[in-house]
C-alpha cells in the first residue's frame, strides 16, 4: 500500500494504491478529497472503510441456512441467530452462534460450515435433533393426579425432548407435591429410546414419601417475650386436633418470610427496637416439619418525650388528644411502632378534616442507647389547603351518576374534608352496588383546587335464587327469589319471593325507592299472600304494607308506614285456647307503625365495629279501624367490637311488650314467641311461650326480652366460614299471670358455624339449655340449622 497527500489552500486530497502481494491483480486506486485540515482523520477513517469493504465483499454471507431439523421448524433456530445476510464471515461470531443454538436444548449436535452457492457464500448450520416425545409415563404417583402433573409440565407429547425444559418440569412437579404437603418427594426421569426410531418415551419416577405437617414451631433466643404469645401472631402453626377442619399445620413457603417479618414487628411493637430475627429454618423429618426462628431481643426501650414539629394547626395539648401514643405511654411505658404508625394516619386524617388533603406526617425518633429511651416527634408539613373543583364518577356502566353522587357527603366547591370523604366511601359501600370504591384527588390548574374522582367497580346486583331450605319451625321447604338491588341503575330494589313447605306457603312482592327524586325520603311497598298451618289452627292472609323512611343526621333513620291485612282462621281444634277460637273466620288487621334506627356499624353484611339501635312501634285498631286492637313497642340494641382481624365480639339484646288497645284480647299471632336459632338457641323454635292453663297450647307472651352474646371467629375469610361460641338468655311471659324469675328465665350455651355461601347465609348451631323444662326435666342439647331463603 502506497500513496500521496496533497494540500492546496484549505483543501486536501489523499491518493492511495493497494497492491496485490502476489502480483496477480493490478494495483487498486482509492482517492478522497476534503475541505479543512481538521477533517484529515475522518478522511483516513473513510478510506480505511472503503479498502476493508473492497477486500471483504467477496467473503460476505449471501445466505444463512439450517439443516437437519425434522420436527422443529428451521425458523426456531434462525430467529435466535444474530448473523444476517451481508455480514462478513467471522469465525468467533460463528462459534457464539453454535453455542446459542446448543443452549436451546433441542439438539444433540450442532456444526457450522461454509458453502459456495450461486449467489455467493452460504453459512450452513447442521443440527441433530433430540428424540421426539411420543409418550409421557408417570410412575409412583398416587397422591397427585397424573393430569395435574402433566398440566404443570412444559414438556408435551409430540414435542422435541429439551433438557432445559425438562429440568424445569422436574422442579415444577416437586413444587406440586410440596403444595400438597409431600416435602420429601423426589422426582427423577429417564428417556427410553427405541433403536432406530426418532422418538422416545419420557418416564417420570416419583418417590412421594410421607405427607408432612408442621409438628413444631420454635422461637429460639427469647428471654423476656413469651413464646406462646409470639406464636399466636404467626400464620404458620403446629398441627392440632382440629387441623383437618381449620387447615392449620400445613407449611406454606410464602408464609415463612411473612412470619419472620411478623416476629420483627411484634418485637418493635413491644419496645425491642434493636431486635434481630433470623431467616426461618425448616427441617424436614420423617414424622413432620420443624420451623425455627432465632430471635435476639436486645434491650427494651421506654417511651420518652412525645412532641410535634413543623406546620401545626393546633396546640400540642390538642394534638396529643388526636394521637394514641400518649395514652399508650400512660398504660404501657414501652415504645410501640404500630401505635406510632397509627398516629401518622390519625394526624393525616385530622389535617384532612381541615382541608389539608396532602399533609405529610413523618415520625422522627431519637434513641438513647444508654438510657434505653426513645423520644418521638411528629414532623408535620400541612401543604396547601384545597377545595373540590368537581366530583367525577368513573367506572359505572349501569349505575347512573346521580345514584353515586347522592351518596357523597362532599360536593363541587366544598372545602376538602377527610371525614366527609370517608363517610362518602362508607355510604357507597353500604349500597352494595359496588364491589370496590376508590377515590382519587386529581390536581387542576389551580394549586388550591382538585378534582375528586370517584372510581367504582360494579358488582352483580341481581339474583335468581332457588333452593331447598330447612328451619325447625317451617321444616323442609322450597324457595325461589328474583331480586334486583339496583333496578334500571337508579338504585331501586325489587324482589319476588316464593316459599313452599308443609307448614307455610307464601308469596311476597316488594319494591323500594331509597331516594325519591334523589332526596332523602324513601318509599317502599310489600304485597303478600300466605297460608300457614299451626298446631291448633290454620291461617290464610292477604295484605299490603306501605312504608316511608327519612334520615335524621348521618347515622339515624325515622320510618313510618301502614299495614292492612285480611286474614282467616280456620280448622281450629276443639280444644284450642279461647284466645284462638275468638278469631275464627275472617278478620281485618289495620296497623300503623313508627320505627327509629341508628346504625354506626362499618358494614351491613359483615360488621366488625359500631352499634345498631332499633325501636319498632306498631299501633293496631282504635281510630284506624280493624279487628285487632293492640300496641306493640319493640326495642333492639346490638354492638360489635373487633378484638383482632377476623375476631369480633357481638352482643344483642331485644325486648318488647304488647298492650291491649281498647276492647278485646291481643291476637295470638301478635304476641311474642321466642326460642330457636334466631333468639334462644338450644330450645325448640317458638317453644318459650306462656301456655293456656286449660288447653296447654302456646299462646305467646305480652312481655319479652332476650340477650345474645357471641364471639365471632372468621377462620376462613375467603369462604366466609365462621365459628361462633354463644351464650343466650331470655324471658317471655304473660304480665297478667304470676311471674317467677326462676321459672321464666331461660339460658343456653353452644357453638354455631356460619357460612356465607352463594345461596345465602347458612347457620348450623348446637345449643345446650341450662334450665329445666316445664316438666322439671333437664333438656338435652339441640342441633338446629337454617339454610336457603326463608321469608
From Swiss-Prot:
Describe its partners and assembly state.
Part of the Bam complex.
User: What cellular component terms from Gene Ontology apply here?
Assistant: cell outer membrane
Q: Name any one Pfam family assigned in the record.
A: Omp85
Organism superkingdom? Bacteria
What protein is this chain from? Outer membrane protein assembly factor BamA
**Record key words, sorted:** Cell outer membrane, Membrane, Repeat, Transmembrane, Transmembrane beta strand
What residue range is the signal peptide? none
Q: Where, per UniProt, does this protein localize?
A: Cell outer membrane
Membership in a protein family: Belongs to the BamA family.
Q: Which GO terms describe its biological process?
A: membrane assembly
Predominant place of localization: membrane
- Purpose: Part of the outer membrane protein assembly complex, which is involved in assembly and insertion of beta-barrel proteins into the outer membrane.
**POTRA domain boundaries:** 59-130, 131-209, 212-298, 301-383, 386-459
Entry's Gene3D superfamilies? membrane protein fhac, membrane protein fhac: a member of the omp85/tpsb transporter family
Keyword Transmembrane tagged:
yes
Extract the PROSITE patterns matched here.
POTRA (PS51779)
